Amino acid sequence: MVEVARFTAAIARTPGLTNRLFTAREQLTRSGHPRGQASLAARFAVKEAAAKALGVPTGMDWHDCQVVSEDSGRPRLEVTATVEAAAAVMGVTDWRISISHDAGIAAAVVIALG
């Protein structure tokens, strides 16, 4: 869970944080518009939950854990490099995610399958 106001404040006071946490693809909606702070906070909640499911891999790059939207709008987790390697060690081969944001809170559930 991520408090949207706290997340927004952290982004505002830390130059470059958005680019460190999110790929260019994640920062835009499927129609190419900038994604809102609540949506970014929810995507960060997914990344944080995935990292915790893997025991917070040493040297994890946030870009190696990307939340993308399918054509249907359904969110999907794509893992590469550092996160993919950590998942392989744990036998994780697939992910299920759910994202929500309401009343100033962004929440995510991540299930690592293998």
Which residues does each predicted region cover?
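Core catalytic alpha/beta fold that binds nucleotide/phospho-ligands
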Residues: 1-114
